[in-house]
Amino acid sequence: IQRIWNMFIHLNFTSPLAWDMCVITTYLVINGLDIIWLRRGDERKVKMLSYVALPVAILVHSVTAWIFGLEIAKEGWYSAIMAPIFVASACDSGLALLMVVLAAVRKAGVFDCGRELFANLARLLATFIAVDAFFIGCELLTTAYPGTEGASHVLGIMTSGATAPFFWFEILGGLLIPFVLLASAKRRECTGVVVAASALVMCGVFCKRVWLLFTSFTVTNVYGAPGISSGPTAARG
């Protein structure tokens, strides 16, 4: 309790963790108000709240991404495009989960959104997958092209090292295969195909989090303090 209280009275706005706490708290309040007003049937307030909820939802994923993207000492994290990647991943994984839930409640006879809407959502999911793949491609190209020692080490771990299975599953199973399945209008009308593609997308995003997080953890930040080229030995001297 004391630590939580200290976060409020000694809030450090130079830290992305402070931004994350503020945004997530705001998002929780918005969700609480949304549930209350939906139960009361107050559509006007719900509509007004939606104008605030969307940008805050984007900020939730952006600020989480900045916790990683602003880590200058981490070769695989320090990137300006980290926030767009997180937002794109949230869009495709969130919509994929929605597709699975819609298919489940329709099969249970609880709610049917209609085949046309279901197919349109599947097409939107294919678009989100393409955007996510584009951002990841941009990040990989920017990392690989300079050919620096640190970047090459990170890419080696990611593509052929410890986290390679997660990386390749995300690229092939989480992006390529679902996009191919959903690119066809005929296949988008098949509930089983859409559910399978959605499940692959969710697994792919999970694998992305694994290779993104653990690949950079395996790379040493800096040997010795900043400005000391030969490390602890020079510092003692």
Outline where the language-model segments fall.
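Hydrophobic positions within alpha-helical membrane elements
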Residues: 4-5, 144, 213-214
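Short, membrane-exposed interhelical loops at transmembrane-helix boundaries
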Residues: 7, 152-159, 219-236
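Long, contiguous internal "core" modules enriched in hydrophobic/ aromatic residues
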Residues: 17, 21-191, 204-207
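Hydrophobic alpha-helical transmembrane segments of integral membrane proteins
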Residues: 67, 207-221
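Central hydrophobic cores of alpha-helical transmembrane segments
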Residues: 193-203
